[in-house]
């Protein structure tokens, strides 16, 4: 009798194992094959963009150039070339981390945001994420060098609320789950 119970336990265990394997295998076979999950991400950082509209060949601007390592004169051309490269690469996501502007000049943020929006229109489905850096908000060094008398003046600084409004096309996107 013991042999029969032992054989019955073996048979029951084998039957349960077959049922278990079958029930787990069928859904796995019926599931869709995994999609190609390649995600192309472009990252840009420390743009230090300075609008050409704020540049004038004055003594104050020359002093600023000689006092700073940022490529103020070249920043617009560099940014243009980088955006052309992004257009050619057609990434799914563009992450632009601060410092976005020279020193948080609101006019520079507005000009950059306009270019980013154009880039987003040129690349269907492109998600753009923008993160401010220490140069981008409440910076007292914001300057405009293109003045009537050739003297640099304080440019309009960007406050956190301004930043969010300027880059509204980013922060109104429901995929952005947290802001400031």
Language-model-detected regions and their locations in the chain:
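Bacterial N-terminal signal peptides that target proteins for export
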Residues: 2-15
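Residue-level detector of short, conserved catalytic/binding motifs and their immediate flanks
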Residues: 18, 39-42, 126
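Active-site micro-motifs of SAM-dependent methyltransferase domains
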Residues: 22, 49, 102, 136-137
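N-terminal active-site segment of His-dependent metallophosphoesterases
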Residues: 30-109
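Extended active-site neighborhood of metal-dependent phosphoesterases/phosphodiesterases
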Residues: 111-180
């Amino acid at each position: 009798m013991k042999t029969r119970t032992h054989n019955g336990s073996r048979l029951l265990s084998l039957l349960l194992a077959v049922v278990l394997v079958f029930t787990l295998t069928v859904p796995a076979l019926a599931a869709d094959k995994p999609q190609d999950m390649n995600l192309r991400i472009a990252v840009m950082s420390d743009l230090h963009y300075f609008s050409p509209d704020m540049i004038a060949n004055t003594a104050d601007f020359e002093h600023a150039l000689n006092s700073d390592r940022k490529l103020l004169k070249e920043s617009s051309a560099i940014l243009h070339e980088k955006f052309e490269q992004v257009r050619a690469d057609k990434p799914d996501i563009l992450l632009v981390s601060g410092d976005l502007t020279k020193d948080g000049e609101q006019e520079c943020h507005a000009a950059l945001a306009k270019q980013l929006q154009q880039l987003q229109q040129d690349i269907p489905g492109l998600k753009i994420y923008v993160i401010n850096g220490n140069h981008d908000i409440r910076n007292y060094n914001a300057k405009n060098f293109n003045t009537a008398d050739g003297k640099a003046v304080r440019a309009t600084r960007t406050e956190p609320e301004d930043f969010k409004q300027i880059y509204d096309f980013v922060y109104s996107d429901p995929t952005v789950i947290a802001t400031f």
